[in-house]
Amino acid sequence: MLMPKKNRIAIYELLFKEGVMVAKKDVHLAKHPELADKNVPNLHVMKAMQSLKSCGYVKEQFAWRHFYWYLTNEGIQYLRDFLHLPPEIVPATLRRQTRPETARPRPKGLEGERPARLARGEGDRDAYRRSAAPPGADKKAEAGAGAATEFQFRGGFGRGRGQQPQ
């Protein structure tokens, strides 16, 4: 598709910087949300990425009316040559994230052993298990409707309700 070179360069710069590109499948969208400051239409983004996909420079995924494009190694090299970038600059998807040390301090204890569990509910759990039924009790005799001698059946709601009880 014929498009201004500044739009193509803006698309390629964003793609190289992030390593991925997302676009809603809407050709009538006036501006791509991530390139709104440069007035790049969403159609230009979709067609530029379609071109890169046909050359094998990006992989495409589509889900829930959104396109997702991921740079391949060949695509990284192509964009480096196209944008005249040095090899030290890499997309964000290839950078290692620096993780700070964990916020929670680890418990001090023996290195080889796990720390003891908190006994918050263990006593309650054991008491419940012991008092639930004495050993040798008949569980089948305790199950069922109980000592009620008169049962009352009520009709359901909706179509099969039938007569009103009197």
Swiss-Prot record:
Q: Which UniProt keywords apply?
A: Cytoplasm, Nucleus, Ribonucleoprotein, Ribosomal protein
GO terms assigned for molecular function: RNA binding; structural constituent of ribosome
- Compositional bias of type Gly residues: which residue ranges? 155-166
Keyword set includes Cytoplasm: yes
Highest taxon of the source? Eukaryota
Q: Where is this region: Disordered?
A: 95-166
What spans are recorded as compositionally biased (Basic and acidic residues)? 98-129
Q: Where in the cell is it found?
A: Cytoplasm; Nucleus, Nucleolus
From which residue to which does any coiled coil extend? none
**Pfam families xref list:** S10_plectin
What Gene Ontology cellular-component terms does the record carry? cytosolic small ribosomal subunit; nucleolus
**Matching InterPro entries, A to Z?**
Plectin_eS10_N, Ribosomal_eS10, WH-like_DNA-bd_sf
- Determine if Nucleus is one of this entry's keywords: yes
**Which regions are flagged for Low complexity bias?**
143-154
Which family, according to the similarity comment?
Belongs to the eukaryotic ribosomal protein eS10 family.
Task: Identify the PANTHER family for this entry.
Answer: 40S RIBOSOMAL PROTEIN S10 (PTHR12146), RIBOSOMAL PROTEIN S10 (PTHR12146:SF0)
Task: Please describe the quaternary structure of this protein.
Answer: Component of the small ribosomal subunit.
The protein's role, per its UniProt record: Component of the 40S ribosomal subunit. The ribosome is a large ribonucleoprotein complex responsible for the synthesis of proteins in the cell.
- Could you identify this protein by its name? Small ribosomal subunit protein eS10
Source organism: Ictalurus punctatus (Channel catfish)
> Top-down, what is the taxonomic lineage of the species of origin?
Eukaryota, Metazoa, Chordata, Craniata, Vertebrata
